[in-house]
């Protein structure tokens, strides 16, 4: 009873939450028999919402009810608010706690002062003879053992493997470049072309992909015709004959730059143009005719044909043309200069596009490429043929 008297004295002193520790243990039996106390009673409550830890199986600790002594979780409590206008970090677009509005990519902003230097460097690399395949390597080096039809079949198979492994377009373009440059330096048996194509994809994936497939995957894609040891040995041969120059610019390298320069944005029309240009660039890999052109010329031709195919009533070079041409050309002569340089490339690319896409004959299996998810976004019912005039 002395403990009860002490509790009453405490209540009178202005402590409505009661006492803890020994005072709880000393509650008289008759006081407990009267039933649980109210939350603001002088002695500790036995209910889960009291100031003491709950005895329910699911309770993890002190009660979270708003009327207990613990911190409140209601929005108007002292804790940080989650309302948009509160000071505790708003998620609304205009709030100071982190805007959701799109902002320019920091990497893109950082590279702006060096765009012309990068362009000049890439164009110097693509023109180096050590990084270029021979135009007539089939006759000069291979001696007719490998013809261009066989090359087309090989490239087509490589495109299929790249699709199976979900490789980037850059990886496929690098791999085809490795094959052409390798065959320009050494006579190679035709019955091992699949080993060469597989290994070229393996080397390119190491250079371009974040998570390249394992060598076992490339061995398995040949139905285990070639072992992992043979693929690894072929990898060393390719790197040795290429002098380890595996980072040469390709058509995709310049095409990405051209699309960014003259067609920036993410709207649907620009997306269609990107898909069309990528598709034309892949088609150009199949034909040996395009080996003679610099990658930047083929990329410009793909952009020209792609823009004209999607918008036949517009002039393809209108809009930011000067940004994709050599810096020494004045704006007035840009259009004539570029069209004259890519004329021969542009002249045959539409016919290749028409034949390969809507014909079941030939070595290409580009019906498979059309099944790719991105090509399904690009329906073209009546493609426009670009005449020589």
Curated annotation (Swiss-Prot):
Read off the lineage from the record: Eukaryota, Viridiplantae, Streptophyta, Embryophyta, Tracheophyta
Which Gene3D superfamilies has this protein been placed in?
Cyclin-like (1.10.472.10)
The UniProt family comment states: Belongs to the cyclin family. Cyclin F subfamily.
Q: Does the keyword Cell cycle apply?
A: yes
Q: Quick one: which gene encodes this? A: CYCF3-1
**One GO CC annotation, please?**
cyclin-dependent protein kinase holoenzyme complex
Q: Which domain of life is it from?
A: Eukaryota
Q: Write out the GO MF terms.
A: cyclin-dependent protein serine/threonine kinase regulator activity
**Name of the protein this chain belongs to:** Putative cyclin-F3-1
Instruction: Enumerate the UniProt keywords alphabetically.
Output: Cell cycle, Cell division, Cyclin
Indicate, by first and last residue, each region the UniProt record lists as having compositional bias (Low complexity): 19-43
Stored InterPro entries: Cyclin, Cyclin-like_dom, Cyclin-like_sf, Cyclin_C-dom, Cyclin_N, Cyclins_cyclin-box
Pfam families associated with the record: Cyclin_C (PF02984), Cyclin_N (PF00134)
Task: Tell me the PANTHER family matching this sequence.
Answer: CYCLINS
* Any single biological process term in GO: cell division
Keyword check for Cell division: yes
Cite the residue spans of the region called Disordered. 1-103
């Amino acid at each position: 009873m002395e403990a009860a008297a002490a509790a009453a004295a405490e209540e009178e002193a202005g402590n409505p939450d009661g006492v803890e520790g020994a005072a709880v243990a000393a509650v008289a039996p008759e006081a407990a028999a009267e039933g649980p106390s109210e939350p603001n009673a002088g002695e500790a409550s036995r209910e889960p919402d009291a100031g003491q830890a709950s005895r329910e199986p699911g309770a993890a600790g002190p009660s979270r009810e708003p009327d207990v002594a613990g911190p409140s979780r209601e929005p108007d409590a002292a804790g940080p608010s989650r309302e948009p206008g509160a000071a505790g970090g708003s998620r609304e677009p205009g709030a100071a706690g982190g805007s959701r509005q799109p902002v320019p990519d920091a990497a893109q902003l950082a590279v702006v002062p060096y765009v012309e230097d990068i362009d000049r460097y890439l164009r110097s690399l693509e023109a180096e003879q050590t990084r270029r395949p021979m135009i007539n390597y089939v006759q000069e080096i291979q001696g007719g053992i490998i013809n261009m039809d066989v090359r087309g079949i090989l490239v087509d198979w490589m495109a299929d493997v790249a699709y199976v492994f979900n490789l980037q377009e850059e990886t496929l373009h690098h791999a085809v470049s490795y094959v052409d440059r390798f065959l320009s330096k050494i006579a190679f048996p035709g019955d091992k072309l699949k080993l060469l194509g597989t290994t070229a994809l393996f080397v390119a994936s190491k250079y371009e992909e974040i998570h390249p497939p394992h060598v076992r995957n490339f061995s398995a894609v040949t139905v285990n015709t070639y072992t992992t040891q043979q693929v690894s040995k072929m990898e060393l041969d390719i790197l040795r004959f290429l002098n380890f120059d595996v980072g040469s610019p390709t058509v995709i390298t310049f095409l990405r730059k051209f699309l960014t320069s003259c067609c920036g944005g993410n709207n649907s029309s620009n997306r269609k143009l990107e898909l069309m240009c990528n598709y034309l660039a892949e088609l150009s890999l199949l034909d040996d005719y395009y080996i003679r052109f610099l990658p930047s010329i083929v990329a410009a031709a793909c952009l020209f044909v792609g823009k004209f195919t999607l918008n036949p009533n517009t002039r393809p070079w209108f809009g930011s043309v000067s940004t994709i041409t050599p810096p020494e050309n004045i704006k007035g002569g840009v259009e004539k200069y570029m069209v004259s340089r890519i004329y021969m490339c542009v002249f045959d690319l539409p016919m290749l596009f028409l034949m390969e896409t809507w014909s079941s004959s030939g070595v290409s299996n580009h019906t498979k490429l059309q099944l790719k998810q991105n090509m399904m976004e690009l329906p073209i019912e009546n493609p426009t043929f670009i005449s020589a005039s």
